[in-house]
Amino acid sequence: MTDQSHQCVIIGIAGASASGKSLIASTLYRELREQVGDEHIGVIPEDCYYKDQSHLSMEERVKTNYDHPSAMDHSLLLEHLQALKRGSAIDLPVYSYVEHTRMKETVTVEPKKVIILEGILLLTDARLRDELNFSIFVDTPLDICLMRRIKRDVNERGRSMDSVMAQYQKTVRPMFLQFIEPSKQYADIIVPRGGKNRIAIDILKAKISQFFE
């Protein structure tokens, strides 16, 4: 954990795919933004830092194990977190779930008082853990995560149910057990039942609000 005197406070939210990380992050962002203003709080998804695969064919891209730490460009993410803490803006990559690679365009992200960083593999990398002021692990049963993932990937990402199930059995579940679940030990706060745990969200809001004082 980093010293809280840093200009930009980084809060990490990790957990299984479809565990409710994004819902918690978006709820915290929306409700805190109403209190402090958009210029003081932001959200960065770890998914933006999937490695560029534009040099690979589509057939090769779909074979990538997206639940393994090697799929992430954590070195670039680390550089960006450190830049934000120095007060510098970053060019956030844009990742396409349809094309399975980064887009050419980027999004400028200005430093904020608080940045909420959310993703499945955040706590697996000691370098990233060292940049977090505190971390959260969203602990949701895998069967619930699977049902949510099927609904999300079919409806929002253009996937077939068969491909989602095959990926879950081949990589998602094994990688969760090998990398993601063990990283729970590094979390400062564990949130059960995902993004609908209102008590947990209120506790997190109170904690984060301290950084705006």
UniProtKB/Swiss-Prot annotation:
Catalytic activity: uridine + ATP = UMP + ADP + H(+); cytidine + ATP = CMP + ADP + H(+)
Sorted UniProt keywords: ATP-binding, Cytoplasm, Kinase, Nucleotide-binding, Transferase
Top-level enzyme category: transferase
Key word Transferase present: yes
Stored CDD domains: UMPK
Disulfide bridge positions per record: none
A GO CC annotation given for this chain: cytoplasm
Complex and partners: Homotetramer.
Protein family membership: Belongs to the uridine kinase family.
Protein's recorded name: Uridine kinase
Species name: Escherichia coli (strain K12)
